[in-house]
């Protein structure tokens, strides 16, 4: 379990962000660290020939990834640790190739007044999953990631085209948006999630770098990334008292 300052799954509600307890399950491959101390500065030269194409898998689910209506969650993709057991990395940098995700979101009505007469109204709302690149990763003074509202202006903006707030455009950019408009008469429904985005192409290479100052902490958590972290934002907007529970698998292809 990571320390509090690297905790993920922050819930945005009524314009504020609150750190949630780290009880959510995040299944991923963990590599043992075995290395010589390296400088955090990197130069991509002939030494890169020792780097290999790899893939790291991560599941995001559990209590941390359950949202009540009109709330959002901010989290990050875990990068590989420095080590020899794949998936891992051999340098203080990796080349990001592509990110694939696949999973489900379950939308459920929350019954708050059992004495209501007549049929229940439809569950209507908008679910969004947004992949964002953070060019200069660093935690805020509160130890939290930027909330959905801070990054995009307001959660209601998920009904239209999302855009990064002008004050943060130099640091963040949107890489992929998955959005579903939901309208069902049932008390619950399941929606499939699937998508892919590329970071490197024939014209452009996207590199992520790591601090790796402490030999006991050469891992892939947000707090150890110094360049190009990948953030994920979930948002469920609805006028109906309800909740959204997500289970999403991420596969990150990289050269490391």
UniProtKB/Swiss-Prot annotation:
Short motif Bipartite nuclear localization signal, span: 21-42
Pfam family, one: Gemini_coat
InterPro entries the record matches: Gemini_BR1, GV_A/BR1_coat
Record keywords, A-Z: DNA-binding, Host cell membrane, Host cytoplasm, Host membrane, Host nucleus, Host-virus interaction, Membrane, Transport, Viral movement protein
GO molecular function: single-stranded DNA binding; structural molecule activity
Stretches assigned to coiled coil: none
The keyword DNA-binding appears for this protein: yes
GO cellular component, one term: host cell
Subunit organization: Binds to single-stranded and double-stranded viral DNA. Interacts with the host nuclear shuttle interacting (NSI) protein. This interaction may allow NSP to recruit NSI monomers to the viral genome and thus regulate nuclear export of viral genome by NSP.
Name the record gives this protein: Nuclear shuttle protein
Organism for this UniProt entry: Tomato golden mosaic virus (strain Yellow vein) (TGMV)
């Amino acid at each position: 379990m990571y320390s509090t300052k690297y905790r993920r799954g922050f819930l945005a509600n009524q314009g504020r962000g609150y750190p949630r307890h780290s009880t959510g399950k995040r299944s991923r491959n963990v590599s043992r660290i075995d290395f010589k101390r390296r400088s955090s500065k990197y130069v991509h030269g002939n030494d890169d020939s020792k780097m290999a194409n790899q893939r790291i898998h991560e599941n995001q689910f559990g209590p941390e990834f359950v949202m009540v209506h009109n709330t959002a969650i901010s989290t990050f993709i875990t990068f590989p640790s420095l080590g020899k057991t794949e998936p891992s990395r051999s340098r203080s940098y990796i080349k990001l190739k592509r990110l694939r995700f696949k999973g489900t979101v379950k939308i459920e009505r929350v019954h708050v007044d059992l004495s209501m007469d007549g049929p229940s109204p439809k569950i209507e709302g908008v679910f969004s999953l947004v992949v964002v690149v953070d060019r200069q990763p660093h935690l805020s003074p509160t130890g939290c990631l930027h909330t959905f509202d801070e990054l995009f202006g307001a959660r209601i903006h998920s009904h239209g085209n999302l855009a990064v707030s002008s004050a943060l455009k130099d640091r963040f950019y949107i890489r992929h948006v998955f959005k579903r408009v939901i309208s069902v008469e049932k008390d619950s429904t399941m929606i499939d999630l699937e998508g892919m985005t590329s970071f490197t192409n024939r014209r452009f290479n996207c590199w992520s770098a790591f601090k790796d100052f402490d030999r006991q902490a050469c891992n892939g958590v947000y707090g150890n990334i110094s360049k190009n972290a990948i953030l994920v934002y979930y948002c469920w907007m609805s006028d109906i008292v309800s909740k959204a529970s997500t289970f999403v698998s991420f596969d990150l292809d990289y050269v490391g």
